[in-house]
């Protein structure tokens, strides 16, 4: 079975294990309170705590006790069906293909054994964190195994962390119109927790067109106890916007790159195209304008686009980019290093737009400086390290370097200064002079060479002497090699005449 199929088997079981553990924990509490009238089989006791009700045939112990029976696939499918029937929010979300003949039932039983031994601790929050990390690990591994197709549901963690760290979503509405498996939302809630904020201060809205990926997102968020409005079903964001009236405080997104079959010919008069009608052959600037359309008056957006969007003039895209720049919406552009994504080797950049750049609020509600008429360019192509031959990752220090530069620049902590080769504040006049091209490399210049203090004349003499010695050594070695070749030739000729 390939990774694309296997992931649903594994992730479905992880989800079932999580909700069963949370259920069992509450069940034990109610049993202990039985003398006070508590009933562990009362569904309302679980719903009131924000937990899923797990009917008897769907409980993990039932599956564990029958893990090596030939009917285990049917039992797991039945458990999933029972969960959906008893919990309306899970309807049509869970995988139900465990009984199919192509699934090795012995391996399925071994998986159940392995997850049964997973130690998640005694507290619900601790269990959620451990299983959430396991779920995230498998998402990343399956994305890597699937390659290009894996990119449809997974954005690398380092990219998500940079986006979230830049926008710092403390309070308000967070929106991702192409949410994949929900990674932006998970990191947003994690950010709030790490900075001692209140989870209830952000509300989450999302949309996903792929039905399978939409289900992954629902399970991923449920495992972590994250409430989100992803709509009642999957839907195409361009043609069936599930949140038409939403004006978000934060938009985080990794839209599919350069898609040509987005149905743009049917949307030529759409109200979202304030800055120009996007070409039917590429949806990049349709996504950008969709984000802008859904921003609140003080909203900010951070998203990933292929580097071509920074400079293209094809099919009117240059004019759209120019109009967005002249509307003073572009706050920051970050060129990212290559090989971050499992799905593509296309170089990417992060765009940050702000609806109101005259003021606004940053981390912990601090007021921001007026950035009107300026754009921050960051060239981060040289940071990060290779995790393996094909994938690069960013360290915490790498990510902090990018996010810290942005926060300092917008007046949100620390002192900002241009760093040749890495970051530069450019005026709109400078951007106009470059033809409204937003490629950071055009603005940041090159890193300053460190002066080692050695006078030029002395360095020139030293290097010339070294080069002369290397030439002499090269000539000596060449002479020895030619001498050996001559001897070899003489010996060979002598043998031929014998």
Model-based region annotation:
Residues 262-282, 308-317, 337-343, 389-394, ...:
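Short, contiguous acidic/charged loop-to-helix segments that flank catalytic cores in large enzymes
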Residues 101, 124, 178, 206-210, ...:
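Hydrophobic alpha-helical scaffolding
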Residues 260-264, 302-303, 312-315, 333, ...:
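Extended hydrophobic-aromatic, low-complexity segments
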Residues 1-170, 229-242, 335-338, 356, ...:
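Non-catalytic, mostly N-terminal accessory regions of nucleic-acid modification and defense proteins
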Residues 247-248, 272, 282-284, 298-306, ...:
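Active-site lining segments that contact anionic ligands and/or coordinate catalytic metals
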Residues 17-30, 142, 192, 196, ...:
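A generic secondary-structure signal for well-formed alpha-helical elements
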Residues 6, 10-18, 163, 214, ...:
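Conserved Class I SAM-dependent methyltransferase catalytic core
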Residues 149-253, 258-262, 267-269, 274, ...:
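Conserved S-adenosyl-L-methionine
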